[in-house]
């Protein structure tokens, strides 16, 4: 709300940005998903969406175990699939997002915007870009892991 005099700040703290992936998403009957499994910077909204993909993947496996009597080894597959993609994809993409948002150099920002315009102008590049940032590429990669 605009006002004539400045606001007084009662408290402030620096938010430390972390980039980590748990060593395992499974330890016996304990399973990790979302922020419990992987922490990344909040710029770009990737953490919550990636956590939803963890949940969908894990829920499908738990349903097969519960309803179909599938082996609990499926939970190790969950770990392999989602941890691998968190390391290969989520960490890389969130670090890239942070660098892009925090660019200080006008020339670097201009080059980045030019790159985005080139992506938009090329249908194949645009499709590849959207598959990556929408996490569809990551889901496909995870599903390919056996």
Where are the regions a protein language model picked out?
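Short amphipathic alpha-helical face segments that pack within enzyme cores
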Residues: 53-60
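FAD/FMN-dependent oxidoreductases across multiple families
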Residues: 1-46
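C-terminal helical "tail/cap" subdomain of flavin- and related membrane-associated enzymes
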Residues: 3, 23, 45, 61-146
């Amino acid at each position: 709300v605009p006002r004539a005099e400045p606001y007084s700040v009662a408290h402030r703290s620096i938010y430390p940005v972390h980039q980590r992936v748990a060593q395992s998403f499974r330890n016996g009957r304990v399973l990790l998903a979302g922020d419990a499994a992987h922490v990344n910077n909040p710029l770009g909204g990737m953490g919550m969406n990636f956590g939803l993909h963890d949940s969908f993947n894990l829920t499908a496996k738990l349903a097969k175990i519960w309803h179909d009597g599938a082996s609990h080894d499926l939970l190790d597959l969950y770990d392999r699939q989602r941890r691998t993609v968190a390391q290969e994809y989520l960490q890389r993409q969130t670090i890239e997002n942070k660098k892009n948002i925090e660019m200080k150099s006008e020339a670097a920002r201009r080059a980045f915007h030019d790159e985005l315009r080139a992506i938009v102008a090329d249908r194949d590049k645009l499709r590849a870009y959207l598959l990556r940032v929408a996490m569809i590429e990551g889901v496909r990669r995870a599903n390919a892991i056996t």
